[in-house]
Structure formats: structure tokens, C-alpha cells
A protein has these predicted regions:
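FAD-binding core/adjacent interface of flavoenzyme oxidoreductases
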Residues: 1-10, 64-153, 229-237, 247-249, ...
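Mid-to-C-terminal Rossmann-like scaffold of FAD/NAD(P)H-dependent oxidoreductases
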Residues: 2-6, 12, 25, 289-388
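Beta1-alpha1 glycine-rich phosphate/pyrophosphate-binding loop at the start
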Residues: 2-76, 167-188, 389
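C-terminal catalytic lobe of FAD-dependent flavoproteins
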Residues: 6, 239-265, 340-420
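Catalytic nucleophile loop
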Residues: 13-16, 158-161, 317
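Residue-level detector of alpha-helix initiation sites
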Residues: 14, 39, 112-114, 137, ...
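A Rossmann-like FAD-binding core segment of flavoenzymes
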Residues: 29-31, 71, 77-94, 101, ...
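FAD-site-proximal beta/loop scaffold in flavoenzymes
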Residues: 125-149, 221, 225-228, 240-315
Length: 425
């Protein structure tokens, strides 16, 4: 490959770091510039709501790579570099402050940002004790607000909200979770798993309120701290919930503004194909900022997960280096709450049957999601071996018998064998 060709990677999260390193490994011979908009060296984000927030992991353990790894790979890492504009015609990236960089190929790994709370009480700006969680600094700010006896109100009962709730309980805080939907984790899992996790949190002393709409914040004077969250409950009654700290986890917005301003095709994310290529032949994109057409599910999807970021980054690197290998990986996710590990593969949306295998009481089980008898997704709690078998089986579109699937006396491996393998057995 031409040693004069320059690859510029915008975004130094999981996708950006993986893409830069993979491009070098797959033969990119020219300069590689990795631009991160934070002052911190690239770091793992999942622990921010878990071990790092709970004080069980130090900042020094968060790094995605040692600094020497970038130097060894000949990657120039530039921190605190925020991109203002992309000129596709000139192949130039302009940073805030006016510095310009020429690229031969460009990778957009811009990630996402928290969806902001928009209710009365926010007009004077973000209160000092109201937090979002996306960065290391965000996690540090939350940890500083959470102490034994403080009352923490978590707005949002998704992954982030429940993980923050679990970590806050470990730190001794009194925690209330407010979820607008009728159940927690409503966007990502089925009724049974939602009920299980609500029970887990309530058993740990968390007050979980579902079907609740936040109607406003009460502040200590104009521009002061939040002292209460006002809500409308499922019965239509208005309530005032005192709060020492508020953490908002109501979703994420993809950072697509640079791509959109540059004229790239977008649709709730930067549109990429199975090689992570965009509508511009000289630009790829990977991670939370993208959408792609899923072969497995037959629709356009946007995934917010580290595994997807890594798989897309590797596909992008291969494409850039003339070694295309399409990304056809199964979507999967994980969440650590208390002593439980939830692993999820596939997308359960649209399922018409949920089969439980294992012991809910013993907190080691799987929820298999079927649509028309065909396996489309699985959630596993403290059942890693069953999870891996099911994850591998998802691309096979297996038709499964629900009764057999629920019967733990029947080996799962025999049920999930592809038809050809089953015939040989």
C-alpha cells in the first residue's frame, strides 16, 4: 500500500482504536492519525456505570491499550482534538481552532451522546447534582454525589439506569428508579426478564417505579441544585420525590452531525454496508454512530454495543486495506448488575413466544425468544455456556420445540444443532 496514503480516524473510543490498530495490522502502510476529543487516553466505557462507578476499578485500569501500543503501531494519537468540519472534495478535516489535516481515507467513529432531559426546571441549565453518563468525568461526578444515605433518583430503567442503580446501592445510597414504560428494560428484553430484574433491584432495596412520567425538577433557587423530581404516576397522580442527586439515562443520540454536514447518507445514524463503507468511497464508519441493513433480521438497525463497534471496525479496516471481509456478526450485549451477568444475543423485538430454561430462583437461566417457532434471540443470566451455544445457533434460523427447549434434561447442544449436523448425528 502507498506509504503516502494517510488514514484519519475521528473518534478514539472502542471503534476508533480497534479500526486504527486493525488497519495497521492488515497492511495500511501510511500515516494513521487517531483523533480523540477527550483529554483522557482511550478507555473502556462499560465499567463507567459498573466497577469504576462503584469504586472497584481504578482509572489506571480503564485504558484500551498502553500508550506504547499506539507508538509501536505507528499511530499518532491526538487528544483533545474536536473536529469542526469535513471537506470531502478536498479530503481535508478541520479541527476546532482551525488546524487542518489531509486524509486519503477517513474513518468516522464518532459514537453518541446522552439524550438530554427536557422538562420544566432545566431552563436555567444543567444542575450541578444532575448527571448524565458517557465519559470518565461523568462517572467521577456521579461517584462524588453518591454517598451512604444520599437519595439518588435515576431517571430511566434501561441498561445504564439499572447499572447506575446497582452501583449506587453498593455505595450505600437510597435509590429510586423512574421508568416511563410499564416495565424496566422494555426496549431490549421481554416481560419475564424485565420482571426478574425489577425483582432483583427491589430485593436489593431499590424503589422501582414504572409507568411514571417526569414532569419537572424542583431546584434550590434559580439555577440551584435539584432538590426534588416531580412525576405523574401510573394512576395519573402527581408526586414530589426528594433527591440529593439525579442521574439521567434515557437513551443515546448518535453523533452524525459531521457526516450529515458533509453530505453523507444518514438515517438515524451514518448508513454503512457490511464492510462499514459509507456513501463516500473514501470514508468508512463504525460503532454507535452507524446504522446498517441486517441480513439476519431483514431491516435497518442501529446497535449501541462494544461488540458491534469492534466487528464493524475490523470490517472497515479490511475494506480500507483491500482485504474485504463482511461483518455478518450476531448482535450481542451484556450488562453486569450486582453479582449477575446478563448476556443478550439477537434482537427479541417481534417475538411471539418466550421459553425459560434453567432456574430463575437460582438466578441461572436463559430466556429464548421465538417467532413462529424460530429462534431469534436469547437472554442469559449467569449461564455463559448456554448463551454461547445459542448465540452460535442464531444465524441458522432454527425451528425449535418449546417444550424440549424448556427441558433441562435434554442437552441444549442437541436442540441447537444445525439440521445437517443433526441428520448426521
Amino acid at each position: 500500500m502507498d506509504t503516502a496514503s494517510t488514514l484519519v480516524v475521528i473518534g478514539a473510543g472502542h471503534a476508533g482504536v480497534e479500526l486504527a490498530l486493525a488497519a495497521r495490522q492488515q497492511g495500511w502502510a501510511g500515516p494513521i492519525l487517531l483523533l480523540g476529543d477527550e483529554a483522557h487516553e482511550p478507555y473502556h466505557r462499560p465499567p463507567l456505570s459498573k466497577a469504576f462507578l462503584a469504586g472497584a476499578a481504578a482509572a489506571a485500569t480503564l485504558g484500551l491499550r498502553e500508550r506504547a501500543a499506539y507508538e509501536k503501531a505507528g499511530i499518532t494519537l491526538r487528544l483533545g482534538a474536536r473536529v469542526a468540519q469535513i471537506d470531502r472534495a478536498a479530503h481535508v478535516v478541520t479541527l476546532e481552532g482551525g488546524v487542518t489535516m489531509h486524509y486519503t481515507k477517513l474513518a468516522l467513529c464518532t459514537g453518541g451522546r446522552p439524550r438530554l432531559l427536557d422538562v420544566p426546571g432545566m431552563e436555567a441549565g444543567q444542575p450541578a447534582n444532575l448527571h448524565y453518563l458517557r465519559t470518565q468525568n461523568d462517572s467521577l461526578a456521579i461517584a462524588a454525589s453518591v454517598r451512604p444515605g444520599t437519595h439518588v433518583v435515576v431517571i430511566g430503567g434501561g441498561y445504564v439506569g439499572l447499572e447506575v442503580a446497582a452501583s449506587s446501592r453498593k455505595l450505600g445510597a437510597d435509590v429510586t428508579v423512574l421508568e416511563m414504560q410499564p416495565r424496566v428494560l422494555a426496549r431490549v428484553t421481554g416481560d419475564a426478564m424485565s420482571a426478574f430484574y425489577q425483582g432483583v433491584h427491589e430485593g436489593a432495596g431499590v424503589c422501582v417505579r414504572t409507568g411514571v412520567a417526569v414532569t419537572g425538577l424542583e431546584r434550590d433557587g434559580a439555577g440551584g441544585k435539584v432538590i426534588a423530581v416531580r412525576v405523574k404516576n401510573a394512576q395519573g397522580e402527581h408526586e414530589r420525590l426528594p433527591a440529593d442527586a439525579v442521574v439521567v439515562g434515557v437513551g443515546m443520540l448518535p453523533n452524525i452531525e459531521l457526516a450529515e454536514a458533509a453530505g453523507l447518507a444518514v438515517d438515524r445514524g451514518i448508513i454503512v454496508d457490511e464492510h462499514a463503507a459509507t456513501s463516500d468511497p473514501d470514508i468508512v464508519a463504525a460503532g454507535d454512530c452507524t446504522v446498517h441493513d441486517s441480513v439476519l433480521y431483514g431491516r435497518r438497525i442501529r446497535l449501541e454495543s462494544v461488540p458491534n463497534a469492534l466487528e464493524q471496525a475490523r470490517a472497515a479496516a479490511g475494506w480500507l486495506c483491500g482485504k474485504p471481509k463482511p461483518n455478518q456478526s450476531v448482535p450481542w450485549f451484556w450488562s453486569d448488575q450486582y453479582e449477575l451477568t446478563l448476556q443478550m444475543a439477537g434482537l427479541s423485538e417481534g417475538h411471539d413466544q418466550c421459553v425459560i430454561r434453567g432456574s430463575v430462583q437460582a438466578r441461572s437461566f436463559c430466556a429464548f425468544y421465538l417467532k413462529g417457532g424460530v429462534l431469534i434471540a436469547v437472554d442469559a443470566v449467569n449461564a455463559p455456556m448456554d448463551f454461547m451455544q445459542a448465540k452460535r445457533a442464531l444465524p441458522e434460523h432454527l425451528a425449535l420445540d418449546a417444550a424440549a427447549l424448556a427441558d433441562t434434561l435434554i442437552p441444549l447442544k442437541s436442540l441447537l444443532a444445525p439440521p445437517a449436523a443433526a441428520a448426521l448425528a
